[in-house]
Amino acid sequence: MKYFVSGHRDLSYDDFRKYYVPVILDIIRSDRNPIFVVGDCKGVDKYAMDFIYTSLSQMHGYMESPYYLVIFHMFDSPRNTPNGLPEEELEKKGVLFAGGFKSDEERDASMTNVSNYDIAFVKDNRWDSGTAQNIKRRHGI
């Protein structure tokens, strides 16, 4: 299954650990072939890519899929990469990149389209945020 991780740029790492880490770990334990899709922004995107990469980079050779993490970015290159590593090194370890999007909305809609499930937390009831729009898009709201 493919999981779209989205969240606020200003979420604290403590809140990421509280709301996202348990869900991601449950998926890693229960899905033998998880594929996570994330954006390349700071905040939840960066926390998620680092956590997922650190958790799965040693296991990807045992998984059915040759990749487990896809980072979607605008333009030619991502703003952030897992643990700040170069794209070439990451691609050898199960991380793919999908770029060239012209807007956040185009990129996020593509992530919704290629995934089956959202991992998202709306902070402070901010239902006009990009994170909330991702959830609404999934459910046709």
Across the structure, where does each feature detected by a protein language model lie?
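Acidic/glycine-enriched connector segments
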Residues: 9-141
